[in-house]
Amino acid sequence: MQIGLCSLGDHRADPTTGIRTSQAERHANILEYLSAAEPLGFDTVVAGEHHFSDFIMAVPQMFLTWVAAQTSQVRLASGVTLLPHHDAVRIAEDFATLDVLSDGRAEVWVGKGVEPGLYRHFDQ
């Protein structure tokens, strides 16, 4: 069995204090969290793409590239890449580059997303 660690890039206020960190601080927290996967024995790191919401991971391959530089074995997966909003060739190139930089650890998981309003933001 393989077990992965996932972040969807949530950026919400603390339910107890109501305080919301800056985006830069939350990005740093996410990177620290994902980088801990390998030393803790997880097999895969998954970063999910989100736009225009309380989730701040618009380009998961950037996060995965950073994690690749900090690790040597953990698999690196998008969960998911919203293919309808991108040029498929560009996504293939991005993940092929990540795959080379990570010595073959990249996985691209694609989907259509769950937010119908997102298509308006991308003029679709």
How would you describe each model-predicted region?
Residues 2-23, 85-124:
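Flexible, glycine-rich active-site loops centered on histidine and acidic residues
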Residues 1-71, 75:
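N-terminal beta1-alpha1-beta2 module of alpha/beta enzyme domains
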Residues 51, 81, 113-115:
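Catalytic metal-binding/acid-base residues of hydrolase active sites
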Residues 60, 66-70, 76-78, 100-107, ...:
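Amphipathic repeat-derived elements
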Residues 77-85:
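The substrate-binding groove and active-site-proximal loops of carbohydrate-active enzymes
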Residues 48, 79, 109-111:
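Structural motif
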